[in-house]
């Protein structure tokens, strides 16, 4: 069974754990740097990206997260997690982890009161996935090596680049675990490649 970590500094941690377990993988809440070595993949949950960055800096997680990103192990960023993975953020000089060749705009769908749900078609996942958008970012631009998995209107809301997956919405806030299951499969495939 693959072990999937959920960065446990802030955000919808418990919901991600439930979704990982429902997808047939073992979930580990990552609160210490050394736990990164024990896991096969990592979820960066939604939350408030500036608060999350402050906590990442406080607990000296940034370099270990960048090292993890270079290790070939899959990472999945949802909402604020997408912001952490992006190489370019509109209105900001520097990226956070900066692992994905995407440009992201923060709070692009508006403030908290503008939160909404939308039925999405997601490549590799299926139709009618209910995306929960809460002060969500979206992808403005992608490099050629990034696959766009889903759009809401003309806005890119789910993307994949090699072992990295990012979504504007919160897949863990519904009982539909297909997006998490898709990531679990990515982790299994990456682990199999390492064995071979």
Swiss-Prot record:
MF term (GO), any: glutaminase activity
Keyword Lyase listed: yes
SUPFAM superfamilies named among the record's database cross-references: Class I glutamine amidotransferase-like
GO BP annotation list: glutamine catabolic process; pyridoxal phosphate biosynthetic process; pyridoxine metabolic process
PROSITE patterns: PDXT_SNO_1 (PS01236), PDXT_SNO_2 (PS51130)
Entry binding sites for L-glutamine: 47-49, 106, 134-135
Role: Catalyzes the hydrolysis of glutamine to glutamate and ammonia as part of the biosynthesis of pyridoxal 5'-phosphate. The resulting ammonia molecule is channeled to the active site of PdxS.
Subunit structure: In the presence of PdxS, forms a dodecamer of heterodimers. Only shows activity in the heterodimer.
Database matches in NCBIfam families: PLP_synth_Pdx2
Family: Belongs to the glutaminase PdxT/SNO family.
Protein name as annotated: Pyridoxal 5'-phosphate synthase subunit PdxT
Organism: Bacillus cereus (strain B4264)
């Amino acid at each position: 069974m693959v072990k999937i970590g959920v960065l446990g500094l802030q955000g919808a941690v418990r919901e991600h754990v439930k979704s990982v377990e429902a997808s047939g993988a073992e979930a580990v809440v990552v609160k210490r740097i050394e736990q990164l070595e024990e896991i096969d993949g990592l979820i960066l949950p939604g939350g408030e990206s500036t608060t999350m960055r402050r906590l990442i800096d406080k607990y000296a997680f940034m370099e270990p997260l960048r090292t993890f990103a270079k290790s070939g192990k899959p990472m999945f960023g949802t909402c604020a997690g997408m912001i952490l993975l992006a190489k370019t953020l509109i209105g900001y000089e520097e990226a956070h982890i900066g692992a994905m060749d995407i440009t992201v705009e923060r709070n692009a769908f508006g403030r908290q009161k503008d939160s909404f749900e939308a039925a999405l078609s997601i490549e590799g996942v299926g139709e009618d996935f209910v995306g929960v958008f809460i002060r969500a970012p979206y992808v403005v631009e992608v490099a050629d090596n990034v696959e766009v998995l889903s759009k809401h209107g003309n806005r890119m809301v789910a993307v994949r680049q090699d072992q990295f997956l990012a979504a504007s919405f919160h897949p863990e806030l519904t009982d539909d675990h297909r997006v998490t299951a898709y990531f679990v499969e990515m982790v299994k495939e990456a682990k199999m490649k390492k064995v071979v």
